[in-house]
Amino acid sequence: MGLSLRVRRRGGSVSKKEIIPVTSCSEEVEITIPSQFQCPISYELMKDPVIIASGITYDRENIEKWFESGYQTCPVTNTVLTSLEQIPNHTIRRMIQGWCGSSLGGGIERIPTPRVPVTSHQVSEICERLSAATRRGDYAACMEMVTKMTRLGKESERNRKCVKENGAGLVLCVCFDAFSENANASLLLEETVSVLTWMLPIGLEGQSKLTTTSSFNRLVELLRNGDQNAAFLIKELLELNVTHVHALTKINGVQEAFMKSINRDSTCVNSLISIHHMILTNQETVSRFLELDLVNITVEMLVDSENSVCEKALTVLNVICETKEGREKVRRNKLVIPILVKKILKISEKKDLVSVMWKVCKSGDGSEVEEALRLGAFKKLVVMLQVGCGEGTKEKVTELLKMMNKVMKMNGFVDRSYSSSIEFKHVKKPF
């Protein structure tokens, strides 16, 4: 018979809590957690009890959050602690495990024995062994140490913090660069990149190792193969320094790798951000992406993608529209105006959307303005002004409205989506 658990406080008291197993027959049996097994912070059953300097026992996760918030006192006694060290309370932990096992004949799940958190000394030792193995070119030993870091990171957030704070990031970057020209080191490089994603931000020395030609070549190879960690790491590197962007654009086949990457859900957003950084650098990069049909692919993304993807795609289109060649490509896509009009009030970040529409309409032959007007853009843009937007966006919206107003007067066009009953409060009409 299946058994589920519900937790409730008795009479609103914070000192007592009940666990109520509910059987499929709706029979309830109440079990009160002994007060000595409850964490004084959360009043929940302790899974990893530790003693602090005041002599009070807490659940490790809760007391660590307390210390990380800047407190250096005992939550119960309010005394200032001379040390923030946490010592496992094995006696209480064994008592809790025994109580869990005996309650309801084992109906309450027994808490597992917690792993001892890694120490700074242990992390330093792992880093030293990884550095030595890297210098020797010992693939197996490097794989062992990187895998050990991965395992430590999976065990707890505290472990991740300890690994990061004890120099692992630089050692991993050096290892990646050292094996980047080894065609048989793919597994090691994948694992290294995976760990590096929670080592950010990477220092200047580490960045210099990850942005060498050989390192970038391997990161692009991982990206091409669908590695989402590589997509994330590349994006982070490009956001740190424009020189990394210039270095990446020189890598053979990088544009093709990103075009492949934006078609995968797991790597799409990070890859769009990276493309945005790349096309900001020079005309040659923009031209290459245009040859690879970036405009049509990003426009298609706007049709039914999530808002986060749409916003990044619009950012890319906005930069593309800075060039004459790019604007022409965007204008020739028949979906552009309908999609832009449809999305005006549907996405939260509208700056790039308005900018793309403004650039397309301003550089077009007037047909784009007429189409936008016919699809109801006028009313939506007025609503944008009503709600409020940034000064630069407001100027573009106002200019778009002037263009549309001019077309309406010249052609006797009536925007049938425009309702005279709408109250345009707080909107000055310069159009």
UniProtKB/Swiss-Prot annotation:
The lineage of its organism: Eukaryota, Viridiplantae, Streptophyta, Embryophyta, Tracheophyta. Pathway: Protein modification; protein ubiquitination. PROSITE patterns: U_BOX (PS51698). SMART domains: Ubox (SM00504). This is U-box domain-containing protein 20. Keywords: Transferase, Ubl conjugation pathway. GO terms for biological process: protein ubiquitination. CDD domains: RING-Ubox_PUB.
